[in-house]
């Protein structure tokens, strides 16, 4: 019996069930992945007990020599991964990283360009319900109605019209390559700075499967989970000239003490991403996503933008008479985890949506390749085409169990 099970059986039971859910379901939420045992071990370390306000060598507390070393390793590895001059590993999340850059470049009420949430952007890129949309003045840009890819002409037009101080580049549901150089040209034309939020594609950037924004954009932010396979957290990258202002905007600007156990886990994950097999992994992630998109298209489903260049497949389920919510809830019932997602020019409200977003990072971590992904894609199509047929569900559930059984999880369990 573990210490946790003995002291708090209720929490233990919930965590045990989550272990089982991850083990016996197909995780296809694009923003989720599975960390390695070493990453989890670092995350579970006694650094969770240590307060370390400030930065290495400049702390406000004593006893930080080991925390300093861990953070220095994380910084060094982050810079090496991306080829950046500066890295701040302290942001608790991608949202915190984005806000730090906003506060370093904008004053309250200043305007900035950001991708429309309904077209694949992110809450922190100017949504009215987010602080980025309340504190500053967002000017949304979107995708072309026919191609469903970024409308760079619209971006240029909006930039000239509004002359924002900052242009935010990046998305949370955009399956195509982003042309950072085009954004640079637009920004240079009006004297604006650029922040690239590569939270979803950072692993692809590290592995060379997507063009890098380093040296093109002024600021780069990312989460450290998703395709990087690290703990949940944030990261800021830039040139050394912005070090002082960015550091001050993170601490003491929007955060107090850093989460040192998370930074330790980041350091381990960054070390893993620097290994040759990480490139192999990311290449497989992209191959799997392309395979998945092809299956959907062959089966008569509409894939937004006609395919994918990264790890995301955005599927329009309305062509089958379904809503995104119905499809996501139904798939969850059979052990396939996705999320409902708006598609460009969606007629349904966000809480219902017309699409689902699928990703291949977690299944690829689990070991699935094109053959298995093709089977998963067909399984999803079979279920959606027989939606509501309870007699068919048992067949699909059995197929899911067969796949998960063949590719067991490799992560800590409570009894380890």
Swiss-Prot record:
PANTHER family in the record: SERINE HYDROXYMETHYLTRANSFERASE (PTHR11680), SERINE HYDROXYMETHYLTRANSFERASE 1 (PTHR11680:SF35)
Positions where N6-(pyridoxal phosphate)lysine occurs in the chain: 226
Family assignment from sequence similarity: Belongs to the SHMT family.
Single Gene Ontology BP annotation: tetrahydrofolate interconversion
The entry's keywords: Amino-acid biosynthesis, Cytoplasm, One-carbon metabolism, Pyridoxal phosphate, Transferase
Gene behind this protein: glyA
SUPFAM superfamilies: PLP-dependent transferases
Chief subcellular location: cytoplasm
Organism: Leptospira biflexa serovar Patoc (strain Patoc 1 / ATCC 23582 / Paris)
Domain of life the protein comes from: Bacteria
Cofactor(s) the protein requires to work: pyridoxal 5'-phosphate
Residue numbers marked as site, Plays an important role in substrate specificity: 225
One Pfam family cited in the UniProt record for this chain: SHMT
Official protein name in the record: Serine hydroxymethyltransferase
Catalytic activity: (6R)-5,10-methylene-5,6,7,8-tetrahydrofolate + glycine + H2O = (6S)-5,6,7,8-tetrahydrofolate + L-serine
Enzymatic class: transferase
The keyword Transferase belongs to this UniProt entry's keyword annotation: yes
Subcellular location: Cytoplasm
Record note on quaternary structure: Homodimer.
Keyword Amino-acid biosynthesis attributed: yes
One GO cellular component term: cytosol
Pathway per the UniProt entry: One-carbon metabolism; tetrahydrofolate interconversion; Amino-acid biosynthesis; glycine biosynthesis; glycine from L-serine: step 1/1
Function text: Catalyzes the reversible interconversion of serine and glycine with tetrahydrofolate (THF) serving as the one-carbon carrier. This reaction serves as the major source of one-carbon groups required for the biosynthesis of purines, thymidylate, methionine, and other important biomolecules. Also exhibits THF-independent aldolase activity toward beta-hydroxyamino acids, producing glycine and aldehydes, via a retro-aldol mechanism.
Enzyme Commission code: 2.1.2.1
């Amino acid at each position: 019996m573990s210490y946790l099970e003995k002291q708090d059986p209720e929490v233990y039971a919930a965590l045990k069930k989550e272990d089982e859910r991850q083990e016996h379901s197909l995780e296809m939420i694009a923003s989720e992945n599975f960390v390695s045992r070493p990453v989890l071990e670092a995350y579970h370390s006694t650094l969770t007990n240590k307060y370390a306000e400030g930065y290495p060598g400049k702390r406000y507390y004593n006893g930080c020599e080991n925390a300093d070393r861990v953070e220095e390793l994380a910084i060094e590895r982050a810079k090496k991964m991306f080829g950046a001059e500066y890295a701040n590993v302290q942001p608790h999340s991608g949202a915190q990283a984005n806000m730090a850059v906003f506060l370093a470049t904008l004053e309250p009420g200043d305007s900035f360009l950001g991708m429309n949430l309904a077209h694949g952007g992110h809450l922190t890129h100017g949504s009215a319900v987010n602080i980025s949309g309340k504190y500053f003045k967002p000017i949304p840009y979107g995708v072309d109605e026919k191609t469903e890819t970024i409308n760079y002409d619209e971006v240029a037009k909006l930039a000239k019209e509004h002359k924002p101080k900052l242009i935010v580049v990046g998305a949370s549901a955009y399956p195509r390559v982003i042309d950072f150089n085009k954004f640079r040209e637009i920004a240079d034309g009006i004297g604006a700075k650029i922040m690239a939020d590569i939270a979803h594609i950072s692993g692809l950037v590290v592995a060379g499967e997507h063009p890098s924004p380093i040296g093109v954009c002024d600021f780069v932010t990312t989460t450290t989970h998703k395709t990087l396979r690290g703990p949940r957290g944030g990261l800021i990258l830039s040139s050394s000239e912005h070090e002082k202002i960015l550091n001050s905007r993170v601490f003491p600007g929007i955060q107090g003490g850093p989460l040192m156990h998370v930074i330790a886990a980041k350091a381990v994950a960054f070390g893993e991403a620097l290994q040759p097999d990480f490139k192999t992994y990311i290449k497989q992630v992209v191959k799997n996503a392309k395979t998945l998109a092809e299956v959907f298209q062959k089966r008569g489903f509409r894939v937004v933008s006609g395919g994918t260049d990264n790890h995301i497949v955005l599927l329009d389920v309305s062509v089958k008479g379904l809503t995104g919510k119905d499809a996501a809830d139904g798939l969850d019932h059979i052990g396939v985890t996705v999320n409902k997602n708006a598609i460009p020019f969606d007629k349904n409200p966000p809480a219902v949506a017309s699409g689902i977003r699928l990703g291949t990072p977690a299944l690829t971590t689990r070991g699935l390749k094109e053959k298995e992904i093709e089977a998963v894609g067909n399984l999803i199509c079979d279920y959606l085409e027989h939606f509501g047929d309870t007699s068919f569900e048992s067949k699909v559930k059995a197929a899911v169990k067969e796949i998960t059984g063949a590719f067991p999880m490799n992560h800590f369990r409570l009894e380890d």
